[in-house]
């Protein structure tokens, strides 16, 4: 999956250092409901099993790469599908862009590619995401792409000794 500057690809063993850094950054733990660091061994095992089919694991993690046009590709983030329900034709989506690559449009491009993949390859009817109410950049990103708010969970997450609301958004494939 790719467009002019962004491609989405499967995980490779060479991604271990990036995944280790991203998964062990306490500033983003709350996004994945993580409360402890991941060992390199655990992440290596995850990579070994990452080839398994989304229909059996109900989840899929892919890497987002930026291509500068000179055959140089750099991993700038990851994108996840989770809670895949083929019977009900829905899946959750989450995205992480490395801090130094944010605000460059990569997330928007990657999400467009993944929505196309969900609707045209996985035959999904709806994609959903859960965003903390104070994550204004993510809310703006997802709503610009046509996600609509469908639920507001009050005091859903406990973060830094404060309750945080979580908002659920949905995006529908209106062509099927």
Q: Where would I find each of the regions flagged by the language model?
A:
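Short structured motifs
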Residues: 46-49, 77-79
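Acyl-donor (CoA/ACP) binding surface of acyl/acetyltransferases
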Residues: 1-15, 70-176
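Surface-exposed charged/polar residues within alpha-helices that form helix-capping/stabilizing sites
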Residues: 21, 49-52, 99, 116
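A generic structural motif
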Residues: 65-67
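Generic structural signal for secondary-structure transition and capping sites
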Residues: 16, 27-28, 52-55, 123
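A short, well-structured alpha-helix characteristic of acyl/acetyltransferase catalytic modules
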Residues: 1-45, 175-176
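A short helix-loop-beta-strand connector motif used in the catalytic cores of GNAT acetyltransferases and
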Residues: 48-63
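Short Pro/Gly-enriched beta-strand edge/turn motifs at strand-loop
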Residues: 43-48, 150-152
